[in-house]
Amino acid sequence: MENTQVLLNIVWTMVGAFLVYFMQAGFAMVETGFTRAKNSGNILMKNMMDFVLGSIFFFIIGFALMFGGSNAFIGTAGFFHPKSLADADGMFNGLPIGVFMIFQTVFCATSATIVSGAMAERTKFISYLIYSAAISIFIYPITGHWIWGGGWLSQIGFHDFAGSTAVHMVGGLCALAGAKMVGPRIGKYTKEGKPVAIPGHNLPLGALGVFILWFGFNCGSTTAATYNLGDIAMTTNLAAAAATLVTLIVTWVRYGKPDISMTMNGALAGLVAITASCDVVNDYDFLLYTSPSPRDR
């Protein structure tokens, strides 16, 4: 029975890893659909390369910094040979270490790719490659160690089930810093400072990306085939649906008509917000996560 449960956990974790991996395509579609056609190639290349660089550097250095020991601030073992962290049976955190590593690798890549959308259409490709290497080597692994690797945040009871902080906030803060450095897109604001809408060239593609992103993270983060998978999926779905509805209503009232791009971004906001606590919130608690604040376009 124990071996059967381990096999089920392996299969489910790999399914979760592939779902999160496919989120790379979702992010690429959202970013490409919401930007101008002339920049599509650049955006697709950035999304591809942050996964490629993340896979290599997280394997060589990042995994060790994140899970290599119980130091409160940084991992100290497993550099260049992360499989050395496994026990005598090749297991790590209840899974074969290769399974656990690929699951964590796709999380690292997701954190990296968040920045691409925030700096779309105004970032040099070489600069983005340098950033992708940096977040995969030390930014994401070190902060991830604090939360999931036995670091100081986990020691004081910090709870982040699937990455609201470890993945999305880390990527979001990097995106904020990058957006501050490069500034707004040319033509985004008038001389008086009034924002000007820059419509995306392919809204159906953006919508498809949103749906691909819907369930990717949370259910797989159990890394086990457990009875609460349905509860996690339901809470995730309700939070995203409620955030979408709230955003639709707010934008409709504010702008006089529904706004598809803002509404789809509202869905993403709900998904990000529920990620940390989707395994512990009760029925209707998801309503607390449904108040994104639309800004002027």
Predicted features and spans:
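Hydrophobic alpha-helical transmembrane bundles of multi-pass membrane proteins
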Residues: 1-291, 295
